[in-house]
Amino acid sequence: MCIRDRVKAISKEYGDETVVQYYGATSSDDRAKAIKSFQDPKSKVKYFIGNPQTTGYGITLTEAGTVVYFSNGYDLEKRLQSEDRAHRIGQKKSVTYVDFIAPKTVDEKIVKALRNKIDIASQVMGEELKEWI
């Protein structure tokens, strides 16, 4: 199931007004509207659909209590940056990160590689960087 199919499924289940999208083809105006709607506690928007490549830098998503990754890339920095969009100054609640991983797929290999990168970075830095995946 591709991202657009997932967006359609969520929209169908919870209503179009509850979902915003933020990805490479999203215009600058639509991106700004998506963030504003998601961050507004009075808004009906409850689901922000994006990817680490486009949501990793320069945005705040502190209204998120749960972040779900349908897919990952091998770039650890982008993953950590995308996590930090929800967990930053202004966040008043804990944030849960969930990875959907189909067994015996490239996603499983990518998450394993990300875990290894975290382990290596922790050894080099002399501390635990993150406890996620």
Annotated model-derived regions:
Residues 6-11, 32, 46-71, 75-94:
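SF2 helicase motor core recognition
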Residues 16-55:
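Conserved helicase ATPase core of P-loop NTP-dependent helicases/translocases
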Residues 23, 50, 62, 98, ...:
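Residue-level detector of conserved, well-ordered beta-strand and adjacent loop positions
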